[in-house]
Swiss-Prot record:
The lineage of its organism: Bacteria, Bacillati, Bacillota, Bacilli, Lactobacillales. Pfam families: Ribosomal_L1. Part of the 50S ribosomal subunit. InterPro entries: Ribosom_uL1_bac-type, Ribosomal_uL1, Ribosomal_uL1-like, Ribosomal_uL1/biogenesis, Ribosomal_uL1_3-a/b-sand, Ribosomal_uL1_CS. Gene3D superfamilies: 3.30.190.20, 3.40.50.790. One of its GO terms (molecular function) is structural constituent of ribosome. One of its GO terms (biological process) is translation. It comes from the Bacteria. CDD domains: Ribosomal_L1. One of its GO terms (cellular component) is large ribosomal subunit. Belongs to the universal ribosomal protein uL1 family. Binds directly to 23S rRNA. The L1 stalk is quite mobile in the ribosome, and is involved in E site tRNA release. It comes from Streptococcus mutans serotype c (strain ATCC 700610 / UA159). This is Large ribosomal subunit protein uL1. Keywords: Repressor, Ribonucleoprotein, Ribosomal protein, RNA-binding, rRNA-binding, Translation regulation, tRNA-binding.
């Protein structure tokens, strides 16, 4: 613990806490200040000036990052018949119906993405208390309730991320791994920022992005200039 604290202090010394860095500078600093002994995740966190209590100011969706996430996603699909076979052929890790519901209710959660065909939502709905709090519940807005299960599986395996503003207007997501080339992280960051910018509600007033931070697993937060894109 003492060694980790020393490493964090050393990393913090390289960052000017009073400065908002450009995208390129922030990515370079994130790679430089990373001290994790594993391939750390690179994440971004936005604070948006929105009121999620208003229906027209709720921000939620999904996108495929240009260079993927670097993370191997374990995909679970609720489907039957031909659609179940499509999911398996597309590379889904787990495919089933009631058997998976029982397994999940028993405490099994070894998956990262849940996809379902519309006709399966009646049984998937029984998992709301388990999947909902973990942001795993299939939803049409994120493309995880669909008849095109093959496409959904392929996108999830190929770098698809989902995002959602919480009650305080915070949106967090992964944009890659520290091992990525800096230009690939920058490209992913810019692609996600474009999505957030376009999602600005017409009724939102004042400064839209009030705070933007880039960080790595265990690493310090680096403030990013939202106008540097």
């Amino acid at each position: 613990m003492a060694k980790k604290s020393k490493q964090l202090r050393a990393a913090l010394e390289k960052i000017d806490s009073t400065k908002a860095y450009s995208v390129e500078e922030a990515v370079a600093l994130a790679k430089e200040t990373n001290f994790a002994k594993f391939d750390a995740t690179v994440e971004v966190a936005y604070n948006l000036n929105i009121d999620v209590k208003k229906a027209d100011q709720q921000i939620r969706g999904a996108m495929v990052l240009p260079n993927g996430t670097g993370k191997t996603q374990r995909v679970l699909v609720f489907a039957r018949g031909a659609k179940a076979e499509e999911a398996k052929e597309a590379g889904a890790d787990f495919v089933g119906e009631d058997d998976l519901v029982q397994k999940i209710n028993g405490g099994w959660l070894d998956f990262d993405v849940v996809i379902a065909t519309p006709d399966m939502m009646a049984i998937v709905g029984r998992l709301g208390r388990v999947l909902g709090p973990r942001n795993l519940m299939p939803n049409p807005k994120t493309g995880t309730v669909t008849m095109d299960v093959a496409k959904a599986v392929e996108e999830s395996k190929g770098g698809k991320i989902t995002y959602r503003a919480d009650k305080a207007g915070n949106v967090q997501t992964i944009i890659g791994k520290v091992s990525f080339d800096a230009d690939k992280l920058v490209e992913n960051f810019k692609a996600f920022n474009d999505v957030i910018a376009k999602a600005k509600p017409a009724t939102a007033k004042g400064t839209y992005i009030t705070n933007l931070v880039l960080t790595t697993t265990q690493g310090p937060g680096i403030k990013v200039d939202a106008n540097s894109f």
